[in-house]
Amino acid sequence: MKKYALCVKTPMTYNAGSKAVIDATEIAISAGYEKMFYACVIPAFSNYKCTKYLIKLINLILCIFASLRISKSNQYFLQWPFPGRNAKILFRRLIHKQARITILIHDLNDLRGMVYPEDIQIMYPLFNAAETIIVHSDSMKDYLILKGVASNKIRILYTFDYLTDDMIVDRTFSRTVAFAGNLSKSKFLQDITIKENDYQLYCYGANYDGCNPGIVYKGKFSPNNVSKIEGSWGLVWDGTSTQACTGEFGDYLKYNSPHKVSLYIVAELPIIIWKEQALAKYITDRNIGIAISSIEEIPYKLSNITETMYQEMIKNIKSEAALLKTGSHLKRFL
């Protein structure tokens, strides 16, 4: 039996979302899988009309070639959502051949209110054909069971691995909070009011519009250079409100394991997380962070943390970081 990781040849960007996919592929390779490319992304040439058609043709050929190599006796690892116009060709071949399939879910668009009938038509037949499906949380598992996916094939990852050999300088307690991500979709940032001596909020990421003078914008960094993040805490929050995680992105946190959680862990930043977020219990049970009901609660929560309590969290988060940096979480299921 051979093992293949189905993947797109893609460049690294400043968006940590692509790092999650790239890291998972590298972890699969370290577990004995071989890469099988079914598509490629060539951004330097994609804006030229004459080359767009050539890229489409190349990707169609790659997908057909990969499909013809599918065998029932082999093991295939794929990551969902599965990009590429031609991916359905590959899915149907996997199902038809009754291949052994392991699926790692990064996002479920129907949980985000983004329902594409053509995706749903192939997604659940593919999930039902899979041998193993790796999800983010207990709530995501429950959702898939409600959709008819057998519970015995579902495994829970909780936190994504984050491959990096970046060295972190030991952190000390302060009232400085970091927030990393796509800042344009983090609408709650517009409404945060930070009083003097409450705390400082450092923001990292693309598309910041300077909407809040109380925020210190620190620019962006390569996802592999996590030591660039300053501060003592990492904030996990999303949506349109500071009172609760609301809206399309906020509601999704009840199911999702944001990649920024893993980023903060390997950066050795104890986490401040919404109490209803899917990973809140995971984080508080392991004493690697604190849970809040609203952004306004941050000053009160920080005022009750001592240096001793903080250093206990740092000790715990170092242990967790060591696992994520070596791909230990995903390897359990490969």
Language model segments and positions:
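A charged, aromatic-enriched C-terminal amphipathic alpha-helix characteristic of glycosyltransferases
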Residues: 15, 293-301, 306-334
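A short, active-site helix/loop in glycosyltransferases that binds the activated sugar's phosphate group
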Residues: 113, 129-153
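Conserved catalytic-core segment of nucleotide-activated headgroup transferases in glycan assembly
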Residues: 162-230
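Nucleotide-sugar-dependent
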Residues: 226-267, 273-281
